[in-house]
Amino acid sequence: MLRRKPSNASEKEPTQKKKLSLQRSSSFKDFAKSKPSSPVVSEKEFNLDDNIPEDDSGVPTPEDAGKSGKKLGKKWRAVISRTMNRKMGKMMVKALSEEMADTLEEGSASPTSPDYSLDSPGPEKMALAFSEQEEHELPVLSRQASTGSELCSPSPGSGSFGEEPPAPQYTGPFCGRARVHTDFTPSPYDHDSLKLQKGDVIQIIEKPPVGTWLGLLNGKVGSFKFIYVDVLPEEAVGHARPSRRQSKGKRPKPKTLHELLERIGLEEHTSTLLLNGYQTLEDFKELRETHLNELNIMDPQHRAKLLTAAELLLDYDTGSEEAEEGAESSQEPVAHTVSEPKVDIPRDSGCFEGSESGRDDAELAGTEEQLQGLSLAGAP
């Protein structure tokens, strides 16, 4: 009886094994085989302008199994790049079509419609459509930007909202003047300090005890340090003020503290001053900056007005006293001239006595000369 010899796959001939491995590699598209990278292929991977024919399926046939793996890898890379390009193009066109849906005409076919298939125009036509949509979108964006700029930028005739109307210039009162002896340039971030130049004259508005004063220079109100200035004496100006007031015929001196505060528009501080001992104008003349700090009057304009009023009141009183003294001194010579006839009588007699004694001395001198002449004549 004949027995069949068992077959073993491992005992096959080498030629059969080689053919079997070749068939397997061609059936599985040779994915496991390493592909050499080419710089030319990498540059064309995601190029939308790459023209690949539509009828080329890219699937290798059994006749191409004997060709080199390099050519097979290039074909598969081209197929993959074409598929990716189409997917990316679909996504970009879909996004643009959604944005431009309101502006496009009705009835225009959308690339994302169900009629769109793989047989649609190639990458070149898709790139052309994409560029046309970009050109169509640019004018819309430019119009939107122009309208936005027109809304944001004000017209030449209308005033801008950011600019504030200029504040009125401060006109007083002032509590003194000071001349700058040292140049000082403030920081560009410090908008409250004054730029000082040697020789400038500052009108002082307030002199707080901390050392940073408030003044007016070149039409600008700002702060400055007292170490850069020398305070100018105000005595001459203070004495001249009453005369100017009298010459101009202004209102006379107030009689009460309440009347004074009404004139300078600070009636609100009347009760504060009265409760702290400033009940008369004589008391108000002694008002100083330290007293204002004790009274908790911190408004710079109110402080300047009160201090200026106190100084003017003091100057007014001192000027009136000096005027009275001058009037008295001018009246004294008149009194002396009236009393001169009574007082000059004994003085005249005294003068006569002096003249007689002088006359006697002259006579004695004459007699002595005569005696000398006689003695000379009698000599041999």
UniProtKB/Swiss-Prot annotation:
It comes from the Eukaryota. Residues 173-234 form the SH3 domain. Pfam families: SAM_1, SH3_2, SPIDER. The modification Phosphothreonine is found at T61, T103, T112, T318. The modification Phosphoserine is found at S27, S34, S42, S97, S110, S113, S120, S320. Keywords: Disease variant, Phosphoprotein, SH3 domain. One of its GO terms (biological process) is positive regulation of interleukin-4 production. It is linked to Immunodeficiency 102: An X-linked recessive disorder characterized by recurrent sinopulmonary, cutaneous and mucosal infections, and refractory autoimmune cytopenias that appear in early childhood. Affected individuals have bacterial, viral, and fungal infections, as well as hemolytic anemia, thrombocytopenia, lymphopenia, and decreased NK cells. The disorder may also manifest as a hyperinflammatory state with immune dysregulation. This is SAM and SH3 domain-containing protein 3. Residues 1-76, 98-174, 237-256, 318-380 are annotated as: Disordered. CDD domains: SH3_SASH3. Residues 252-316 form the SAM domain. Gene3D superfamilies: SH3 Domains, Transcription Factor, Ets-1. Residues 318-327 have a biased composition (Acidic residues). The keyword Phosphoprotein applies.
